[in-house]
């Protein structure tokens, strides 16, 4: 019984770790974002958007 409990705890820890690290679908490089938006005479900013269970860090020009 104790072995089953330990396996269950380890499984939950690994599952949580994958959920946290695996949810980010894209990264935003702030310097590249600002450079791209400067060409449009706008300010660049990295924003976080969610869709379903995924988190996107996108570059937006304002």
UniProtKB/Swiss-Prot annotation:
GO MF entries: potassium channel regulator activity; toxin activity
Q: In which tissues is it expressed?
A: Expressed by the venom gland.
Query: Is Disulfide bond among this UniProt entry's keywords?
Result: yes
Site annotated as Aromatic residue of the functional dyad: where? 62
Gene Ontology cellular-component terms for this entry are: extracellular region
Q: Does the keyword Secreted apply?
A: yes
- Cysteine-cysteine disulfides: 28-46, 33-59, 37-61
- Main subcellular location: secreted
Q: Where is this site: Basic residue of the functional dyad?
A: 45
The residue range of the signal peptide is: 1-22
Task: Specify the superkingdom.
Answer: Eukaryota
Keyword list (alphabetical) reads:
Disulfide bond, Ion channel impairing toxin, Neurotoxin, Potassium channel impairing toxin, Secreted, Signal, Toxin
What are the subcellular locations of this protein? Secreted
* Comment field on protein domains: Has the structural arrangement of an alpha-helix connected to antiparallel beta-sheets by disulfide bonds (CS-alpha/beta).
Q: What does this protein do?
A: May block potassium channels.
Q: Which family does it belong to?
A: Belongs to the short scorpion toxin superfamily. Potassium channel inhibitor family. Alpha-KTx 23 subfamily.
What's this protein's name? U10-buthitoxin-Hj1a
Species lineage? Eukaryota, Metazoa, Ecdysozoa, Arthropoda, Chelicerata
């Amino acid at each position: 019984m104790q072995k089953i409990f330990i396996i269950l705890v380890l499984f939950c820890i690994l599952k949580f770790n994958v959920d946290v690290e695996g949810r980010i679908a894209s990264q935003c490089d702030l310097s590249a974002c600002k450079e791209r938006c400067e060409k449009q005479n706008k300010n660049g900013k990295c924003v976080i958007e969610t869709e379903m269970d995924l988190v996107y860090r996108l570059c937006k020009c304002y």
